[in-house]
Regions:
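Non-heme Fe(II)/2-oxoglutarate
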Residues: 2-18, 57-75, 120, 264-272, ...
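Non-heme Fe(II)-dependent double-stranded beta-helix
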Residues: 2-92, 99-221, 359
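Active-site rim elements
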Residues: 165-171, 225-226, 288-300, 319-321
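Short, conserved beta-strand element in jelly-roll/cupin
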Residues: 185, 218-247, 303-306, 311, ...
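Short, well-ordered beta-to-alpha junction loops that form the rim of enzyme active sites
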Residues: 195-197, 202, 241, 257, ...
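Short, structured patches in soluble enzyme cores that scaffold and shape functional sites
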Residues: 196, 211-213, 236-244, 256
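A short secondary-structure junction signal
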Residues: 204-211, 218-221, 248-257, 263-267, ...
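Double-stranded beta-helix
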Residues: 232-235, 245-317
Length: 383
């Protein structure tokens, strides 16, 4: 045990040195250089060293600044006006809504169209054209899982960024009910950079609580999102219910007030199971929890009718409940940034990206692009 801790400390210390002393990086073999966490900050290294590997950040540490005023950042149609009290609620709690974007019967039609569309291969990330590599090749489904590792990886990519090959989905995120409310929080200019479908099958487990800001978790080495100021609000996520989302069928949950700062993960052991009875995540023999004290009264289930959406900051601890029903729950989310935010590094765009959490690597981003959904892009940082 002591030897393992010493080796871990030594490995992290050497990694830190190589990241800080940049001229040494030119001497490293490419294979080793590609494994270095070049995006880690001093605080990230010191946290894992001081805790001897028991605490680790999986996103860049930051603290959300409160604005000098809670007035809307731009004027909008009065039908979509947010009050100062609502904007203050968002900053204090990390979410706002739900709001209606389309009628339930319209949402049902959109869902049917999109479910049919998802049966086709993505033209943005076509697996048949080697647009990415699935690391997990097993197709067997274990007793306590809905899908095999292979299917989980494939579906995660096939459900990603379909707004780029489906105009009906893109139009949903251009709806003024969504854009006008986001503009009051972010500013008049908005870019959609990522969408993802979130179907939850009958009996499917919930998603453990987690945080995100710059999406360093994608590859655990470098962020995906580069805003001018990490501590400002620079991104919003809109989660749209295509079917009713209830506590019974696996609605989202947000822990209010946890948007104030990004926290490290706590890693403890030993454990033998993959899933605990308290909803925390286990990897092998390690138990993973976010290092934030969660009070049960702060865990807010976000129940919605089909055709409603809510806006939240992924800095907030968020996840979803298990689907205890016999019906599927369908939803789609979109991540929206200001145009002064850079997305993906030049290396990621040229050589490919990784999505570790679903076991995918070498993602070709040639067909990916941002979409201006409101205002103008005065920076031109992104393709």
């Amino acid at each position: 045990m002591l030897r393992n801790k010493f080796l871990l400390t030594l490995t992290i210390a050497i990694s830190w040195m190589l990241v800080k002393i940049k001229f040494l990086q030119r001497l490293l073999p490419r294979k080793i250089l590609n494994k270095l966490p070049l995006g880690w900050t001093d605080e990230m290294y010191s946290t894992v060293l001081k805790s001897r590997g028991k605490k680790v950040y999986v996103d860049i540490p930051c603290q959300l600044q409160q604005p000098t005023s809670y007035q809307p950042k731009t004027a909008v149609d009065p039908a979509y006006q947010l009050t100062e009290a609502e904007i203050q609620f968002f900053y204090q709690n990390g979410y706002i809504g739900p709001f209606t974007i389309v009628a339930p019967e319209v949402a049902e039609g959109i869902k049917s169209h999109l479910v049919e569309m998802l049966e086709t291969e993505s033209t943005i990330y076509p697996y048949s054209q080697n647009a990415y590599v699935i690391e997990a090749k097993d197709r067997a489904t274990s007793v306590d899982r809905i899908r095999s590792n292979y299917d989980t990886s494939y579906l995660a990519m096939n459900y990603r960024d379909r707004h780029l090959d489906d105009s009906q989905l893109l139009d949903l995120f251009k709806h003024p009910a969504l854009t006008e409310r986001c503009a009051q929080l972010l500013g008049p200019d908005l870019m959609l950079w990522r969408t993802q479908f979130f179907p939850k099958a009958p009996s499917e487990e919930g998603t453990p609580l987690h945080q995100a800001s710059t999406y360093l978790l994608d590859n655990l080495k470098e962020p995906v999102v580069y805003p001018p100021n990490l501590n400002e609000l620079f991104q919003l996520t809109c989660w749209i219910a295509l079917t009713d989302a209830t506590k019974e069928n696996g609605c989202m949950v947000v822990v209010k007030g946890t948007n104030k700062q990004i926290a490290p993960l706590k890693i403890s052991k030993p454990y033998d199971t993959q899933k605990s009875d308290d909803g925390s995540k286990r990897f092998g023999t390690a138990k993973i929890d976010v290092d934030i004290e969660v009070n049960s009264e702060d865990v807010m289930p976000i129940e919605m009718k089909a055709g409603q959406f809510f806006i939240f900051s992924e800095r907030s601890l968020h996840g979803s409940l298990a689907n205890q029903t016999t019906e599927w729950r369908w939803a789609v989310n979109g991540r929206i940034v200001r145009p002064d935010t850079r997305l993906y590094t030049e290396k990621m765009l040229k050589e490919g990206h990784m999505y570790k959490v679903v076991g995918v690597k070498d993602i070709c981003l040639d067909r990916w692009k941002t979409v201006l959904i409101r205002g103008e892009d005065r920076f031109g940082y992104n393709q």
